[in-house]
Swiss-Prot record:
It holds the Pfam family AA_kinase. One of its GO terms (cellular component) is cytoplasm. Involved in both the arginine and lysine biosynthetic pathways. Phosphorylates the LysW-bound precursors glutamate (for arginine biosynthesis), respectively alpha-aminoadipate (for lysine biosynthesis). This is Putative [LysW]-aminoadipate/[LysW]-glutamate kinase. CDD domains: AAK_NAGK-UC (cd04251). Its EC number is 2.7.2.17, 2.7.2.19. NCBIfam families: argB, PRK14058.1-4. InterPro entries: AceGlu_kinase-like_sf (IPR036393), AcgluKinase_fam (IPR004662), Asp/Glu/Uridylate_kinase (IPR001048), Glu/AcGlu_kinase (IPR001057), LysZ (IPR037529). PANTHER family: N-ACETYLGLUTAMATE SYNTHASE (PTHR23342), N-ACETYLGLUTAMATE SYNTHASE, MITOCHONDRIAL (PTHR23342:SF0). The lineage of its organism: Archaea, Thermoproteota, Thermoprotei, Thermoproteales, Thermoproteaceae. The gene is lysZ. The keyword ATP-binding applies. Pathway: Amino-acid biosynthesis; L-lysine biosynthesis via AAA pathway; L-lysine from L-alpha-aminoadipate (Thermus route): step 2/5; Amino-acid biosynthesis; L-arginine biosynthesis. The record marks 5, 221 as: Transition state stabilizer. It is found in: Cytoplasm.
Length: 261
C-alpha cells in the first residue's frame, strides 16, 4: 500500500500531472489532499481574513473558527470532487470522502492550544474547530475503489474538524500498514544549501526540524516524516508538478526518509 499526500501547493497550481499518473497505482494507493490556498482565496472573497497561529518550535497552523470551518469544508469538498471527476474521466473508479463519511477519521477537538504571540510570549488560546486524529477506519479506506480523502474529521459529538493534512496522511499510512508515504509539494524535496538532500534517517530529520535552515510547512513535513520512518514507513518528499510525479518520487528523486540508512 502507498499513501500519497497531494499538497495544497500542487492542488492550486496544477494537479493534472498527479492525476494522469494515478491510474497505475489505483489498486494499491490512498490519496489524501490539501488545498489551503483555495481556502484562503474563498475566505478573502467573503471578507474574512485568514488567521494562522505560531506554536513553540516554529510550527504554524490555521486558526479555524466556525465561519472559517464552513469555508474550509466547502473548499475541500470542491477540490475532492474535482479530483474524483478527473480520475473517472481516466477510467479510474474513485470515491471521494471526508473523514466524517462512514466515520473513517475520528478526531478529538483541541479545546486549547499553546501559541507564541506577536511579542514572542507563550499563551494558551481557544483551539477552535481543529482536531487531533484518534482513529482511522483502515478497512474502509483500502482499495478498491481508490479513495480520495480530504482533511476533515468528525468528533464524538458530531463536530466537523480541520485536521492537518500531513499528519492525516501519516495516520492513514500507519493504520493501513502502508510501506510508503509520498508527500507531493511544489519543491523537489528538502533543500539545504541550494541542493536537495536525497536521504535522511528519522533521527537526522528530527534534528533538522530544529534548524533555522528548515522553515514553514517543511518543518511539519519533516516532523511527520521522522515519526512515520520510525514506524517503518519510507517517506518521500518530492515535486508534484513534474511529469509522472509519483513515478519520479518512487524511483529515487526527492528526499527519502527511512528509519536507518
Amino acid at each position: 500500500m502507498i499513501v500519497i499526500k497531494v499538497g495544497g501547493s500542487v492542488v492550486c497550481k496544477d494537479v493534472s500531472k498527479v492525476i494522469q499518473n494515478l491510474p497505475k497505482y489505483a489498486d494499491r494507493a490512498i490519496i489524501v489532499h490539501g488545498g489551503g490556498c483555495l481556502v484562503n482565496e474563498m475566505l478573502k472573497r467573503l471578507g474574512i481574513e485568514p488567521k494562522f497561529l505560531t506554536h513553540p518550535g516554529g510550527l504554524t497552523s490555521r486558526y479555524t473558527d466556525l465561519e472559517t470551518l464552513k469555508v474550509f469544508v466547502m473548499a475541500m469538498s470542491w477540490i475532492n470532487k474535482q479530483i474524483v471527476a478527473s480520475l473517472h474521466a481516466l477510467g479510474v473508479e474513485a470515491l471521494g470522502l471526508t473523514g466524517a463519511d462512514l466515520g473513517v477519521v475520528r478526531a478529538k477537538r483541541k479545546e486549547k492550544v499553546l501559541i507564541v504571540d506577536e511579542r514572542g510570549r507563550q499563551r494558551v488560546v481557544d483551539g477552535g474547530y481543529v482536531g487531533r486524529v484518534v482513529h482511522i477506519a483502515a478497512d474502509r479506506l483500502k482499495p478498491p475503489p481508490l479513495k480520495v480523502l480530504s482533511p476533515i474529521a468528525v468528533s464524538e459529538k458530531g463536530e466537523l474538524l480541520n485536521v492537518d493534512g500531513d499528519q492525516l496522511a501519516f495516520d492513514v499510512a500507519k493504520a493501513v500498514g502502508a510501506r510508503q508515504l509520498v508527500l507531493l509539494s511544489d519543491v523537489d524535496g528538502l533543500i539545504i544549501g541550494g541542493r536537495v538532500v536525497p536521504h535522511l534517517t528519522a533521527e537526522e530529520a528530527e534534528e533538522l526540524v530544529k534548524s533555522e535552515e528548515v522553515r514553514g510547512g517543511m518543518k511539519r513535513k519533516l516532523l511527520m516524516a521522522a515519526e512515520a520512518a520510525k514506524s517503518g514507513i519510507e517517506v518521500v518528499i518530492s515535486n508534484g508538478l513534474v511529469e509522472n510525479p509519483i513515478d519520479v518520487a518512487l524511483n529515487g528523486s526527492g528526499t527519502h526518509i527511512v528509519k536507518n540508512l
